[in-house]
Swiss-Prot record:
Keywords: Antimicrobial
Functional summary from the UniProt entry: May have antimicrobial activity.
Name of the molecule in the record: Putative antimicrobial protein 1
Superkingdom in the source lineage: Eukaryota
Taxonomic path: Eukaryota, Metazoa, Spiralia, Lophotrochozoa, Mollusca
Length: 19
């Protein structure tokens, strides 16, 4: 998944929380 701030568009935001 892309590590963007648009967590609304991603389901794996749990892993992108680092951003």
């Amino acid at each position: 998944v892309l590590s963007h701030n648009n967590e609304s568009s991603y389901s794996d935001t749990s892993s992108c929380t680092s951003q």
